[in-house]
Amino acid sequence: MCQNLVSQELPVLSTTSQFNREQRFNHQENGNYARDTHNERDQYVGLWEYNQNGILFLLKIEKMNRVINKIEAPGFETIYNYFDLLILRYRLVKDNIVVFDNLNENDVDPIANYATKLGSYSFASGRIWDRTRNVRGSHTITRLNTNPAKIIFNLERFDYTKVNDSSFYQDGQPLFSIPQNGIEMVKID
């Protein structure tokens, strides 16, 4: 069982920097805390909007520090580590109908909707859960050097996990309800 628990405290046994590419293989070590030592996450924080072709997609990105990833299995030693993450929430409206909205919810599931910014990579990457279609997909978020501030949110086409039985997805609908293929989003807050 893999969990992310914000409130549970276990001792930090070592610390690595998410900015230091040489330490990237040490981030997952038991008891490690992978910290955002260079404030790389700041550039992504805010409310971002995509509004085209009858689709309004709002993406709220917030920082969450020291999120625990804990793995427990009967008969094995508990393994855990901490990460500084970006947490994603979203509202999806299609043809003026709200399809999904958790923008203002307080419950946070960091394992479902998150991103990390590692090293000198020009993007943050992680997973997002399309709650309408019940599919978890990998994504990248690239900050553009523009005014107004913009990002490219790219929900990957080929890296996903279907949560429902495969028969659920044979309804002639696209696999994801969230827009895909590198959409440009503008910062509105």
Predicted regions mapped to residue ranges:
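Amphipathic/hydrophobic helical signal segments and adjacent flexible N-terminal regions
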Residues: 1-45, 49-54, 66-83, 152-189
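Central antiparallel beta-sheet cores of small beta-barrel/beta-sandwich binding domains
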Residues: 59-146, 189
